[in-house]
Curated annotation (Swiss-Prot):
Organism encoding this protein: Mycolicibacterium smegmatis (strain ATCC 700084 / mc(2)155) (Mycobacterium smegmatis)
Quaternary organization: Homodimer.
Pfam families found in the cross-reference section: dTDP_sugar_isom
Assigned protein family: Belongs to the dTDP-4-dehydrorhamnose 3,5-epimerase family.
GO BP of this protein: dTDP-rhamnose biosynthetic process; polysaccharide biosynthetic process
Site (described: Participates in a stacking interaction with the thymidine ring of dTDP-4-oxo-6-deoxyglucose): 138
Protein's pathway: Carbohydrate biosynthesis; dTDP-L-rhamnose biosynthesis
Any GO MF annotation of the entry: dTDP-4-dehydrorhamnose 3,5-epimerase activity
Coiled-coil annotated residue ranges, if any: none
Gene that specifies this protein: rmlC
Residues that hold substrate according to the record: 23, 28, 47-49, 59, 72, 119, 143, 166
Gene3D superfamilies in alphabetical order: Jelly Rolls
GO cellular component, one term: cytosol
Protein name: dTDP-4-dehydrorhamnose 3,5-epimerase
EC id: 5.1.3.13
Length: 201
């Protein structure tokens, strides 16, 4: 597999090697060695999730408080999603900016979203199925959302956007910052550095 860091520090697009024959397809979508090589630390998986979405479903922008937040390693095993990472780390050089990757069941790419970053995706096909590896269990009291239409994200056109009440009524980035719920660049950098020190030790 190969990894390409996105324009948002701490986010990577991972492209696997696809091996096909008369039986079908095989590929490695995650390896500990491959992850450690690009991230500089191991991925401590604590939970695995699966979501199935109709075309037009928009989930996000979601994030968790740091520490420990919740890093995510995400792939799409059926259909296609426009997967977005948003920099919500106050003090970051790219604060308020976004980048995106197409995840689908053809190229089989994944995206890694490190602690403190915001995550969202738009389902482009019915029954789009997304698998997440998560570095921390779901903790609703530490989970937050920011309005997904607040970042100038160039969402692909779909007949109708479908959002949960929580996401549709989420605060703007400015409102979330004023409420003091956004992570800081310094806290995120410090947390990731502890993960890297643990690898060395």
């Amino acid at each position: 597999m190969t990894a390409r860091e996105l324009s948002i520090a701490g986010a990577w697009e991972i492209t696997p090697v696809l091996r096909t024959d008369s039986r079908g397809l095989f590929f490695e979508w995650f390896t500990d060695a491959g992850f450690t090589e690009f991230a500089g630390h191991q991925f401590d998986m604590r939970q695995a999730n699966c979501s199935v979405s109709a075309r037009g479903v928009l989930r996000g922008v979601h994030f968790a408080q740091v520490p420990p937040s919740q890093a995510k390693y995400v792939t799409c095993v059926r259909g296609a999603v426009f997967d977005v990472v948003v920099d919500i780390r106050v003090g970051s050089p790219t604060f308020g900016q976004w980048d995106a990757v197409l995840l689908d069941d053809k190229d089989r790419r994944s995206i890694y979203i490190s602690e403190g970053l915001g995550h969202a995706f738009l389902a482009l096909d019915d029954d789009s199925t997304v698998m997440y590896l998560c570095s921390a269990p779901y903790a609703p009291q530490r989970e937050h959302t920011v309005r997904p239409t607040d970042f100038g994200i160039e969402w692909p056109e779909v007949p109708e956007l479908i959002l949960s009440d929580r996401d549709a009524q989420a605060p703007s980035l400015a409102e979330a910052q004023a409420a003091g719920v956004l992570p800081t660049w310094a806290d995120c950098q410090a947390f990731v550095e502890t993960l890297r020190r643990n690898l060395v030790s």
